[in-house]
C-alpha cells in the first residue's frame, strides 16, 4: 500500500511519526510532504523521517492563501509521481482534499480542532473521512468517525513513549524539584484570530519562582526579560521534560493535552476551548481551562498558585492518568488499523 502524508504543524509530526514507522515496518510505502512551520522540519529530521517541502506557512491571511494554493499545485505533482492508494492529513486546511478529488484517490483527516471553522468549511467537502476524538463537540456529518482517544496518545501512550530522565538531569533537576513549564503560542493560526491568552507574563514568572524553577517554551520571540527562561533543550525532548514537570501553564491546547496524558496537571489559558481539553478537565481533572477573556488570566493565576501549594500534586496526577489510560486507546495502533483496513474495516478499528 502506498500512503502519502502532509503535515503543516509540529504537532502533526508527532501525530504521524509512529504510524509511518509502523507502516514502513509492515512493508507499506510512505511519503511525507511538509508545509514548513516553526520546528516542523527539525522534528522530522530528528526522527529520521524523509520529507519533501511543498510550501512555507505565513502569518498573514493573504500569505496563507498564497501558500496553500501553491502547495496544492505542488502536491498534485508529487501525488501523480508517487501514485498513492491513500492520502492522510492532520488538522487544518485539507490541502490534500482537492488533490484527492482530481486524482480520484481517498483522503482521510485526523482532526481535533473544532474551532477551525474556515478550514472545515473549505476542506471537508473534498475529503472522504474525518476521524475525531469521541469528545469532539461538533457533528461533522456522515464523514465523521469517532474514536476513544486523543491525538497526543499517538505518541505519548505508554506503549509508545518512555520519558528519558537524562533530560531534566541535564538541566540540573532531580525528581524532588518543582518545575513549572510555561507555554506561549504564536497566535498566527487562522482559528487564533481574535483570541487571547496570558498577557502579564513577567508578573506570572515573578510569583511562580517562589515555588520552583520556571522555564518557557515559546513559538515566538521573547523579550529580553523573558529570554533567560527559554527552554534550553531541543523540541524533540520537550515531552521528556514535561513528564517530570510539576505544573504546565500555557496558551497551547496541544501542550495542555500532552501534559494531561503524561499525568502532569495543566493550566490552559485561551479563549478557545476544544472538546479534548473540556473532557480532560471535567472527567479527569488534569486540565483547568480558563476561556473568559475578561477574567480568565486572573482566575488561572489563582488556580496555579493553589495547585502549587499541594505537596501531593504529582502523585494525584499519576492516579488521574491511570484512569485516563484505562479508558482510552493507543491511537497509533488505531490509525494503523484504519489505514490498512480502509475503507472496509473503519468501523471496528477502535477495538483495543
Give the positions of each predicted feature.
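A nucleotide-sugar donor-handling region in carbohydrate enzymes
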Residues: 131-196
Amino acid at each position: 500500500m502506498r500512503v502519502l502524508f502532509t503535515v503543516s504543524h509540529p504537532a502533526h509530526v508527532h501525530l504521524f511519526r509512529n504510524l509511518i514507522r509502523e507502516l514502513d515496518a509492515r512493508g507499506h510505502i510512505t511519503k511525507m510532504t511538509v508545509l514548513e512551520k516553526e520546528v516542523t522540519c527539525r522534528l522530522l529530521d530528528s526522527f529520521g523521517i524523509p520529507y519533501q517541502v511543498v510550501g512555507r506557512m505565513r502569518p498573514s491571511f493573504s500569505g496563507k492563501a498564497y501558500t496553500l494554493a501553491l502547495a496544492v499545485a505542488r502536491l498534485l505533482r508529487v501525488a501523480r509521481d508517487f501514485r498513492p492508494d491513500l492520502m492522510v492529513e492532520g488538522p487544518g486546511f485539507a490541502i490534500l482534499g482537492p488533490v484527492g478529488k482530481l486524482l480520484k484517490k481517498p483522503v482521510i483527516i485526523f482532526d481535533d480542532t473544532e474551532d477551525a471553522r474556515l478550514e472545515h468549511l473549505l476542506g471537508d467537502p473534498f475529503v472522504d473521512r474525518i476521524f475525531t476524538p469521541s469528545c469532539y463537540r461538533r457533528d461533522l456529518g456522515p464523514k465523521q468517525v469517532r474514536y476513544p482517544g486523543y491525538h497526543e496518545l499517538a505518541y505519548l501512550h505508554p506503549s509508545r513513549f518512555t520519558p528519558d530522565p537524562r533530560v531534566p538531569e541535564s538541566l540540573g533537576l532531580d525528581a524532588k524539584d518543582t518545575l513549572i513549564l510555561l507555554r506561549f503560542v504564536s497566535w498566527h493560526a487562522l482559528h487564533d484570530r481574535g483570541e487571547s491568552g496570558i498577557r502579564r507574563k513577567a508578573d506570572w514568572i515573578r510569583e511562580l519562582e517562589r515555588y520552583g524553577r520556571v522555564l518557557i517554551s515559546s513559538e515566538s520571540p521573547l523579550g529580553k526579560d523573558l529570554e533567560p527562561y527559554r527552554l534550553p533543550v531541543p523540541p524533540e525532548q520537550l515531552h521528556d521534560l514535561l513528564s517530570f514537570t510539576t505544573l504546565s501553564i500555557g496558551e497551547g491546547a496541544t501542550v495542555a493535552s500532552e501534559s494531561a496524558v503524561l499525568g502532569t496537571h495543566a493550566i490552559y489559558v485561551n479563549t478557545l476551548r476544544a472538546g479534548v481539553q473540556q473532557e480532560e478537565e471535567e472527567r479527569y481533572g488534569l486540565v483547568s481551562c480558563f476561556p473568559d477573556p475578561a477574567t480568565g488570566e486572573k482566575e488561572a493565576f489563582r488556580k496555579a498558585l493553589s495547585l502549587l501549594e499541594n505537596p501531593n500534586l504529582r502523585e494525584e496526577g499519576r492516579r488521574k492518568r491511570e484512569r485516563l489510560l484505562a479508558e482510552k486507546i493507543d491511537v497509533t495502533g488505531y490509525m494503523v488499523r484504519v489505514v490498512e483496513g480502509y475503507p472496509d474495516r473503519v468501523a471496528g478499528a477502535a477495538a483495543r
